[in-house]
UniProtKB/Swiss-Prot annotation:
Protein name in UniProt: Serine/threonine transporter SstT
Organism per entry: Klebsiella pneumoniae subsp. pneumoniae (strain ATCC 700721 / MGH 78578)
Gene encoding the protein: sstT
SUPFAM superfamilies the UniProt entry points to: Proton glutamate symport protein
Entry keyword Nucleotide-binding: no
Catalysed conversion reaction: L-serine(in) + Na(+)(in) = L-serine(out) + Na(+)(out); L-threonine(in) + Na(+)(in) = L-threonine(out) + Na(+)(out)
Keywords: Amino-acid transport, Cell inner membrane, Cell membrane, Membrane, Symport, Transmembrane, Transmembrane helix, Transport
Cited function: Involved in the import of serine and threonine into the cell, with the concomitant import of sodium (symport system).
Record carries keyword Cell cycle: no
GO BP annotation list: serine transport; threonine transport
Highest taxon of the lineage: Bacteria
Topology with respect to the bilayer: Multi-pass membrane protein
One GO cellular component term noted in the UniProt record for this chain: plasma membrane
Membrane-crossing residue ranges in chain numbering: 23-43, 47-67, 85-105, 144-164, 181-201, 220-240, 293-313, 333-353
Length: 415
């Protein structure tokens, strides 16, 4: 007869307990520590750095192995939902840009253009953005893995997957086993999320605080309000259009189990393993989500479209530049295209603002001052943007899979 020690029972309960509740506890403790002792809060920031680093380390390998395994083991005639998911990604991004235009006209914001981010070089035009994306596709596979170039990783994974379809069953089984092993490592890393978020919250509050954000309160309200509208109204409408049933159980599940992580890690790449685990929990098709989730992390950028649009129009309002309806609609298209290319640009959505500003004849030095404002409010803006982007990847993947499988739509959210 074996006896369990109290410590082993405690660890077992901790490992099997509700991750969301543990994260909330970590969040509250992080806030309290930042209020009580700033040096201690900064010190425990190492926990957050380690957690984000672990997610970023495992994500490229996870994407490579899952995509390669799913394509190599794909059976001829087996249906996937990649096309409808891709359509939802593009439609969602454009809808977000339109929403941002509407919000910017209803609640016009102005900026204090005093400093410029001179050390950063933005892309000169949409052609350069597209060129960057194409060059990412032909990246060396080792370089793509080392630098977390997910576009390059996807291209190599798809190519190797198709090539390995002609391999023998032993090879395919080996790749499948490796992908399962990597998935297990991801699950272990995710269990440390409460500690990671505890460290991230405490160090962020201790080092930056929120004093600097008050000067841009209206701009932040427009940005965050627009993102909330997209997350809680626009996206549910798109999901309802696909699954023809109440979308909110799925929407809230994705926000709770994907958006919360993304908000604190502020990295779509780091959130790929989290989204993969959520899709597995929802019993979605592995062949579909193993491709759509990393693809979404590179092109599904509703939050980026909102950031580019709102900050560009804030600069326009500050400079008293008149904007007519056709120009505003064109900005929505440009912002959507820029957002889809944000993953191919160092600095992401903020450094694509000068490209959109160029539409209105705004000089580059002024546009870079807008970028500087973006960095000032980045503590909150980047967190909300990433939460919207990443949770939408899982949401649209689930919606498309449920639209194909009615039984899945009925059962996926039970329990």
């Amino acid at each position: 007869m074996t006896t369990r020690t109290p410590s082993s029972g405690w660890l077992s309960r901790l490992a099997q307990g509700s991750l969301v509740k543990q994260i909330l506890i970590g969040l509250v403790l992080g806030v309290l520590l930042a209020l009580v002792s700033k040096p201690a809060a900064i010190a425990v920031g190492l926990l957050g750095t380690l957690f984000v680093g672990a997610l970023k380390a495992v994500a490229p390998v996870l994407v490579l192995m899952l995509v390669m395994a799913s394509i190599a083991n794909h059976q001829h005639g087996q249906k996937t939902s990649i096309r409808p998911i891709l359509f939802l990604y593009l439609l969602g991004t454009f809808s977000a840009a339109l929403t941002a235009v509407l919000f910017s006209f209803l609640f016009p914001s102005t900026l204090h253009l005093t400093t410029a981010a001179d050390s950063i070089t933005p892309p000169s035009g949409i052609v350069e953005v597209l060129r960057g994306l194409l060059m990412s596709m032909v990246s060396n596979p080792i370089d793509a893995l080392l630098n977390a170039n997910y576009i390059g990783i996807l291209v190599w994974a798809v190519g190797l997957g198709f090539a390995l379809r002609h391999g023998n069953d032993t090879t395919k089984n080996l790749i499948n086993d490796v992908s399962h092993a990597v998935t297990f490592i991801v699950k272990v890393v995710i269990r440390f999320a409460p500690l990671g978020i505890f460290g991230l919250v405490s160090s962020t509050l201790a080092t930056t605080g929120f004093e600097t954000l008050w000067g841009y309160a209206q701009l932040l309200l427009v940005l965050v309000g627009c993102m909330l509208l997209v997350a809680l109204v626009i996206n549910p409408l798109l999901v309802f259009w696909k699954i023809r049933r109440n979308p909110y159980p799925l929407v809230l599940t994705c926000l709770r189990e994907s958006g919360v992580y993304a908000f604190f890690t502020r990295s779509s790449a780091a959130n790929i393993p989290v989204n993969m685990a959520l899709c597995e929990k929802l019993n979605l098709d592995r062949d579909t989500y193993s491709v759509s989730i990393p693809l979404g992390a590179t092109i599904n950028m509703a939050g980026a479209a909102i950031t580019i649009t709102v900050l560009t129009l804030a600069a326009v309002h500050t400079l008293n530049i008149p904007v007519d309806l056709p120009t505003a609609l064109l900005l929505s298209v440009v912002a959507s295209l820029c957002a889809c290319g944000a993953s191919g640009v160092a600095g992401g959505s903020l450094l694509l603002i000068p490209l959109a500003c160029n539409m209105f004849g705004i000089p580059n030095d002024v546009a870079m001052q807008v970028v500087a404002v973006g960095f000032i409010i980045g503590v909150l803006q980047d967190s909300c943007e990433t939460a919207l982007n990443s949770s939408t990847d899982a949401l649209f993947t689930a919606a498309a899979c449920m639209a194909e499988d009615d039984q899945l739509a009925k059962n996926a959210l039970r329990g």
